[in-house]
Amino acid sequence: MNKLTIIFFTILLLTYIIVEKEALKIEDLPEPESYKKAKQLAVKDANGDKRAEGIALDFLRQNRRNCTVNCDLVLTCPLLTPECCPKKNDDCLKLDTVKNG
């Protein structure tokens, strides 16, 4: 019984890894100029503090990812994901998060 359980969860884990690896995500698209400017501002506002810079860039990355399915999440969604907000273009519609979301 334990062997079967381990085999089942191993197969399940491998399937999950393969699906996640093959999924088209927002990070796979080229970064728009407005997002690049937002990243530059985040780095500038950190004033050389690497920890604050990392937090700010992570926050921008998460908002960009979450804005693909919900443009009303934050006011800056059109700047972070112009592919998806306010109108979804072809690049946005190809994303797996948008298809499944």
Curated annotation (Swiss-Prot):
<keyword id="KW-1015">Disulfide bond</keyword>
<keyword id="KW-0964">Secreted</keyword>
<keyword id="KW-1218">Voltage-gated calcium channel impairing toxin</keyword>
<protein>
    <recommendedName>
        <fullName>Omega-scoloptoxin(10)-Ssd1b</fullName>
    </recommendedName>
</protein>
<feature type="signal peptide">
    <location>
        <begin position="1"/>
        <end position="23"/>
    </location>
</feature>
<comment type="similarity">
    <text>Belongs to the scoloptoxin-10 family.</text>
</comment>
<dbReference type="GO" id="GO:0090729">
    <property type="term" value="F:toxin activity"/>
</dbReference>
<dbReference type="GO" id="GO:0005246">
    <property type="term" value="F:calcium channel regulator activity"/>
</dbReference>
<keyword id="KW-0800">Toxin</keyword>
<keyword id="KW-0872">Ion channel impairing toxin</keyword>
<keyword id="KW-0108">Calcium channel impairing toxin</keyword>
<comment type="function">
    <text>Voltage-gated calcium channel inhibitor.</text>
</comment>
<dbReference type="GO" id="GO:0005576">
    <property type="term" value="C:extracellular region"/>
</dbReference>
<keyword id="KW-0732">Signal</keyword>
